[in-house]
Amino acid sequence: MDPNCSCATDGSCSCSGSCKCKECKCTTCKKSCCSCCPVGCAKCSQGCVCKEASEKCSCCA
């Protein structure tokens, strides 16, 4: 499995919960693809970008 678990823009996240992806720009998060982006993130559809130095993504902060 790709450790970066990159998702294409407008793609759908199907990464495992243990995946620590660095570039998650999915419009639909089926799971907590990024550790900083929880499943219940209502703004996930706007395009989350995980930052390695932060526990929260730009849209869920």
From Swiss-Prot:
Residues 30-61 are annotated as: Alpha. A divalent metal cation 4 binds at C33, C34, C44, C48. Metallothioneins have a high content of cysteine residues that bind various heavy metals; these proteins are transcriptionally regulated by both heavy metals and glucocorticoids. Residues 1-29 are annotated as: Beta. Keywords: Acetylation, Metal-binding, Metal-thiolate cluster, Phosphoprotein. Gene3D superfamilies: Metallothionein Isoform II (4.10.10.10). The keyword Metal-binding applies. This is Metallothionein-2. GO terms for molecular function: zinc ion binding. PANTHER family: METALLOTHIONEIN (PTHR23299), METALLOTHIONEIN-1G (PTHR23299:SF22). Class I metallothioneins contain 2 metal-binding domains: four divalent ions are chelated within cluster A of the alpha domain and are coordinated via cysteinyl thiolate bridges to 11 cysteine ligands. Cluster B, the corresponding region within the beta domain, can ligate three divalent ions to 9 cysteines. GO terms for biological process: cellular response to cadmium ion; cellular response to copper ion; cellular response to zinc ion; detoxification of copper ion; intracellular zinc ion homeostasis; negative regulation of growth. It comes from Mesocricetus auratus. The gene is MT2. A divalent metal cation 1 binds at C5, C7, C21, C24. Belongs to the metallothionein superfamily. Type 1 family. A divalent metal cation 5 binds at C34, C36, C37, C50. The modification N-acetylmethionine is found at M1. InterPro entries: Metalthion_dom_sf (IPR017854), Metalthion_dom_sf_vert (IPR023587), Metalthion_vert (IPR000006), Metalthion_vert_metal_BS (IPR018064). A divalent metal cation 3 binds at C15, C19, C24, C29. The modification Phosphoserine is found at S58. One of its GO terms (cellular component) is nucleus. A divalent metal cation 7 binds at C50, C57, C59, C60. A divalent metal cation 2 binds at C7, C13, C15, C26.
